[in-house]
Amino acid sequence: MSMWILMYHSCHTLHAIHVANRLHDHPSSDAADSTGKSRAHHIPTATRSASFDRMDCLLALALTMASLFTRLHQIGRRAIVSWDEKFFGSFGNQYINHTFYHDVHPPLAKMLVALSGALSGQNGSFAYPLGDPYPEHINYTFQRSFVAMFGVLIVPFAYQTCRYLGFTRPFACMAASFVLFDNALCVMSRFILLDAPLLCFTAMSLLAYAAFTAYRDQPFSLEWWRWLGFTGLSLGLVVSSKWIGLFAIALVGLLTTEELLVLYSAVSVRPRAQLKHWGARVICLIAIPAVIYTGVFQLHFMLLPIRGTGDYKMPSQFQALQRNSVVAQQPHDVAYGSQVTLRSNLPGFGLIHVNETFRFPDGDQECIEAGIGGKQKLNWWRLVSTSLTRENDTSPIKHVLDGDFVRFFHEGTGRWLRTGAHKPYHVGWGRRMFAGGNDTSPSLLDLWRVHVASEDSPMPRGQLYTVTTSFRLVNAFTGCALQATTEQLPQWGRRLSELICAESNMTQTESSLWNIEQVRDKRFKRANFRRLVKRRLLRNTIWINREMALTNSRLVADSDHYKHTESDPWSWPFLLYPMRLVSWADDSVKYYEVGNPLLWWASTLCCLAYPLQIAYWLARQRRQYSDWRPGELERFWDTGKLLWGGWALHYLPFFLMQRVTYIHHYLPALYFALLLLAFEIQCLASWYLPRIHAWTIAAIAVTGAGLVFCLFSPLTFGWDRPIEELAHLQWLPSWNLHTCKYDI
């Protein structure tokens, strides 16, 4: 990111002059080196293409047909549930069965997987167990082909994008062919995965923005509005498929900010026009993606109205509206003597849980109290008053009111909800929470005062109700408040979330808010929660996204165990650790996620060299060398910053992530890198090989890429013979194609 900012500041002045010249319609002329010996650089096309003729359509069609072959050839050869088909196939089933689930990714791409299953006639009964053969009634070939069509589209999208960026036809064809002949892009489009839709929508976003820039000189025209709106639509689709789409939003956001700042500095643009430019981009690039993203989650909730495996991740109010949910089938009232479960209003914590076997390792032998996601029998507490007699569900009804002092007795262990003098294990403030004492030894340390914060039902505030009442619990002796955290305890605490008692000045947060999720009390009748609880789309969308983020952050690599599928970001551009996708048994149809080495290494070289090129030419320009015709360096920067910036923004953030990473996370960045490679070849060919026909240069590059693709194609289309026969394809010793010192 720092490199991006440095390059932006270095070229901002040049770009502003270029835009101002265009606004004032200044003429341009060729320039030569001050010594008279240097030939001025130029980009082969003078203007960006804003329309497609018949030849462009024919070339795009030919590329599409070739893409269809590479993505669909023998796609049903492996009739076994392979790799992450286990997850995404089963997630698709949830939509067919309408049962709620939880995952780390937004739902759009999984909805498309579900659509493929529905169109193929599935009834949602197949569980997609890893390694099991597909039964006859599952048309897995259709499902894979449906998903593969998104991978097919990125090839013609690449051609169209390059034409809008000013590539000549030969080099636009070359760029699309690079995308066509990359083995990793191809193989990841051939299974029931999310990568193909993600790549398709990423390519669509780049295409839309490139087309929009081609109409930059025609502001507020029909085509200008169409492509600006289509950019927002594409950004909404890509971020609704995977959060990697946020990098595409960041790219368009940075470039849009730069453009608006340049327009702001242009004296020829009136203030009213400035406001129109800002308003158009707010509507199309912020509002449209936000509406699409929220709408996708609204559809997600509508399609999954039945209780499922993931409902425990959602707040109690959401669960109360799910069909077949235990939260919806209980009383609304609660009183002393009721058995209750306590849920935090902090996403990621869950319910307060106690287990007799979970103990602190520092000599304190009290039971750990922590947050757990699922509903378990050790989550239940008896709500009792300060009287010496412990109430139960046969006692006279006495409701819990705001300001009451209460105790919580855990009948599973015979202990009380209690705080003490010890510091929490992870959190650096507050007091430790534990289950202490016994059924005959209550203490002031387990006496809590109820502070009702809000009531989300039509019932009057001031009394405790199930699901709808949010409240705080303040310890009567210490004055600290019961507070949830998302800090996980070590393995001795089963990775559960730590529970603490925070000082009073730390309690005005959602983490100190609680509600009763379930109640057991035969004194009360079952309530109709559909009349008591409101549907809150925005709240549920924010909640589920926070849960997704927390789950995603907890997907960390285990440093004590080697996993052949994992790899670090620094290794991706150099293709050091390709990935086995399936079993490597001799009779298994084997697939290897290895990219086209020629394309990966060449594109990496271009991505590393591009900032150095810009720095070199800027330094020469400061020394009064005229290596470029007027406006040409800015055009080189305009196109290069879009492609290089896309690569950098889709790649470099992975170095900051703590979660486990895989080589397929690099594929969106690779798409930008391949187009940048083609752009560099076009520029270098025009500068240093002007006498060689462009089609000849493009044909040589495409032939080389195609030959390497064919060489590795057995690993892309499936290899069902002993892998030793392909030992010659292990180009690097780090590859685990043929030899690997670890068992898989």
Model regions: which residues?
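Lectin-like carbohydrate-binding module/patch detector with strong preference for beta-trefoil
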Residues: 301-541
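Extracytoplasmic catalytic/substrate-binding loops of multi-pass membrane glycan-assembly enzymes
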Residues: 77-90, 100-115, 122-126, 138-141
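Short acidic/glycine- and proline-prone juxtamembrane loop motifs at membrane-interface regions
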Residues: 82-83, 184-198, 241-244
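Short helix- or helix-capping micro-motifs
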Residues: 67, 175-180, 187, 235, ...
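Transmembrane-helix motifs of polytopic, lipid-linked glycan transferases
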Residues: 141, 145-166, 204
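Membrane-interface transmembrane helices that cradle and orient dolichyl/undecaprenyl
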Residues: 164-166, 205-226, 257-262, 681
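Transmembrane helical bundles and short interhelical boundary loops of multi-pass, membrane-embedded
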Residues: 4, 9-40, 214, 227, ...
